């Protein structure tokens, strides 16, 4: 799947077909603002791909983008992530196939789009 920013029902269909998709991590009143993120979490298919966050209780993910969007800008941070993703992680990217890759960026461009692209190519 080339475009991870699909309508909710198409992203769920993609997950059911074993493809990786991107979802938004943000919650309001305990529920995800992205219905696909909630569905994927309930189904045990959500993988958090971001930094540690004390306020939300998220632990640092091995899939995080180490380059700051705030400091470098989105395009530069994504370019650096794409260019420097290590071979060890590239070898493990197959474990993301059929998972909802969760980050705070969605629906904006995100490093998870690249991870989904790699996973879906496996």
Residue ranges of model-derived segments:
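Catalytic phosphate/metal-binding cores of nucleic-acid and nucleotide-processing enzymes, i.e., regions
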Residues: 2-122
